[in-house]
Regions:
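Bacterial N-terminal signal peptides that target proteins for export
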Residues: 1-9
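Hydrophobic h-region of N-terminal signal peptides that target proteins for export
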Residues: 12-20
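Catalytic-core regions of hydrolytic enzymes
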Residues: 22-152, 165
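Active-site-adjacent mobile loop/cap segments within catalytic or ligand-binding domains
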Residues: 24-27, 38-41, 47, 113-117, ...
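Residue-level signal for pocket-adjacent positions within structured domains
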Residues: 121-122, 135, 157, 192, ...
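Flexible hinge/switch segments at interdomain interfaces of large molecular machines
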Residues: 151-155, 214
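Short glycine/proline- and acidic residue-enriched helix-loop micro-motifs
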Residues: 156-165
Length: 219
């Protein structure tokens, strides 16, 4: 989250990625919310009295702001665009997925802003639904799957319903489309590291049962 100011322009890049898609209904999922603050960072700013103060920036607030901008711009392009939350409140991963079913979304895009305690770590990355055994990705899964209830039963449901097999190819194509355009823009203009396109078993993507990606938009 340490490059969150750079990440705030991310929604403009996403707008470039979507105009050619045949999908007309898009569900934007601002990660975290309510008591789940997500990652956080701090910066110095001046208050209304001109005093320099240290302020904390939470991932939940940043991704909500970015998601609202995405929604506004895409609506101007005549897309049907919904948010899983429009205010700072807790929404379970199951509820987020049920919203996708309710609005009959063609695409599910979950917006996050990763973090690291290592100063040299950072960059942007795009995840699509698929199982894997990479330890680093497992750590990301643990963070982003915290809002789920009954993880074991969910994993069984994923395996039984074969959600991964049904959506992996379309989700991977979506991830490649978005990521390639992000890469061209961010690496050149903001010099943010490309951390690649990666598979991940994210419950919110699996439960939505449709093509989707989880975007870690820069840290």
């Amino acid at each position: 989250l340490k490059t969150y100011m750079k990440s705030a322009i991310f929604f403009l890049i996403i707008l470039i990625c979507l105009p050619k898609t045949k999908a007309r209904t898009i569900l934007i999922d601002p990660g975290h919310g309510g008591s789940d603050e997500g990652a956080k960072t701090s910066k110095y700013a001046f208050d209304n009295k001109g005093k320099r103060v240290r302020r904390t920036i939470f991932e939940k607030d940043l991704v909500l702001s970015v998601s609202k901008k995405i929604q506004k711009k895409l609506k101007e392009k005549n897309y049907r665009v919904f948010l899983t939350r429009s205010v700072d409140r807790s929404v379970s991963l199951e509820k987020r997925a049920s919203i996708a079913q309710k609005v009959n979304a063609d695409l599910f895009i979950s917006i996050h802003a990763n973090a690291s305690y290592q100063k040299l770590s950072g960059g942007f990355e795009t995840y699509y639904l698929n199982n894997q055994s990479n330890r680093a990705i497992k750590k990301v899964e643990e963070v982003e799957n915290k809002g789920s209830q009954g993880e074991d039963s969910i994993v069984n449901q994923i395996l039984i319903d074969l959600v991964v097999k049904r959506t992996v190819e379309s989700s991977k194509l979506l991830a490649k489309s978005i990521h390639s355009r992000v890469k061209k823009s961010l690496e050149i203009s903001l010099k943010i590291k490309d951390r690649g396109i990666k598979p991940g078993l994210f419950f919110v993507l699996a439960l939505s049962k449709r093509p989707g990606v989880l975007l870690e938009m820069g840290f």
